Amino acid sequence: MSHNDTIVAQATPPGRGGVGILRISGLKARDVAQEVLGKLPKPRYADYLPFKDVDGSALDQGIALWFPGPNSFTGEDVLELQGHGGPVILDLLLKRILTLPGVRIARPGEFSERAFLNDKLDLAQAEAIADLIDASSEQAARSALNSLQGAFSARVNHLVEALTHLRIYVEAAIDFPDEEIDFLSDGKIEAQLNGVIADLDAVRTEARQGSLLREGMKVVIAGRPNAGKSSLLNALAGREAAIVTDIAGTTRDVLREHIHIDGMPLHIIDTAGLRDANDEVERIGIERAWQEIEQADRVLFMVDGTTTDAVDPADIWPDFIARLPKNLPITVVRNKADITGETLGISEVNGHSLVRLSARTGEGVDVLRNNLKQSMGFETNMEGGFLARRRHLQALAEAANHLEQGKAQLLGAWAGELLAEELRLAQQSLSEITGEFTSDDLLGRIFSSFCIGK
């Protein structure tokens, strides 16, 4: 579809509401105003007017806002009609607007896409609009707003600018070898490169925090039947999300709860008790449990403290540990401390966290909450933080890899040309975040996930 078309869409959620908003953007927005309102409202002033049908009768009445381009969200002429939020009224008004030539329904995210294409937003800011709408916590919303206001983009642009200056110095020295500049050995380039690498590492750390806020962490509770997995799910969720009985195999399917710990979203998954089951339904539940374990960010290995004194996971259940994906983090949870009399708290055993608690009474659960937060490197106080997506983390990682490769070329092979190429590739990876070097296919995938009226 052409970006020269005029587009229209409902900007408020579907259904009944006090106010319903239609947004129009493009060259024909002026014609829509003349036809529907009978006049062109004063720019950026609210005008209370009837919204007219083809025959001149009123369909509704409400507020009209006129934003002539380029001083608008999309950079084009934009008209907003704010009427009553009844679906029938909005549908009649939308059909009236679509009778005008050159006007069509907007695709999902097309308003934000046009803002990006018209340099009103960079790509990271455009993505932040969707993240702000989808934010599941106050901290996620604040970080998304920071991204929308350019906090993330500013950090990326600072890195790109630093790389630009470094490339200029390196490539000038390559192009003018007769000048008395021994750029490979004077230490200046290495110092500047180390500075950029350090700055990039800091941005990556903040981006991982932002990704946690946006994506959350998937935590799977796994263990033998009757270890207290469902009781722990209920304790973490703060409600009776799962049925708890003394009958082994009560949980036969996957149960999911979405919770927050100091603003960090967690996807907690309770699974069927792992054992050799004869029941077909229970076997299916166990298969699903292993599927969830293989996709987890962390496993809470639930142990009934009344059945064993062992604390090393390899001693508790070696077959279970052997089947876990390599490098999957584990927190061993020794449950039923209210019965065993074990001291509540946390310790380290062979590189694994060990938490002693009682899921039934809730004692020690706060220790586990803090362990989950710290295990992901999450910090509660993130003033000025920003949200990040997986593609951002990937681009930052690629840039870091190119800088390390460039440093190796500088110090190991004294290869200035190869260093310059690695710097260029690092710069390109960073520019993909803000959209300076981004394929049309990626843009389509990003904006198609937006709301229709955004």
UniProtKB/Swiss-Prot annotation:
What residues does GTP bind to?
Answer: 226-231, 245-251, 270-273, 335-338, 358-360
Which GO BP terms apply?
Answer: tRNA methylation; tRNA wobble uridine modification
Residues annotated for (6S)-5-formyl-5,6,7,8-tetrahydrofolate binding in this entry: R23, E80, K120, K454
**Keywords per UniProt:** Cytoplasm, GTP-binding, Hydrolase, Magnesium, Metal-binding, Nucleotide-binding, Potassium, tRNA processing
Gene Ontology MF, one = metal ion binding
- Is Nucleotide-binding among this UniProt entry's keywords? yes
Q: Which residues form the TrmE-type G domain?
A: 216-377
> What is the top-level taxon of the source organism?
Bacteria
Checking PROSITE patterns in the record gives: G_TRME (PS51709)
Recorded source organism is Salmonella paratyphi A (strain AKU_12601)
Residues where Mg(2+) binds:
S230, T251
Matches recorded under Gene3D superfamilies: P-loop containing nucleotide triphosphate hydrolases, Probable tRNA modification gtpase trme, domain 1, tRNA modification GTPase MnmE domain 2
Gene this chain is encoded by: mnmE
Specify the protein name. tRNA modification GTPase MnmE
Enzyme Commission number(s): 3.6.-.-
Assembly and interaction partners: Homodimer. Heterotetramer of two MnmE and two MnmG subunits.
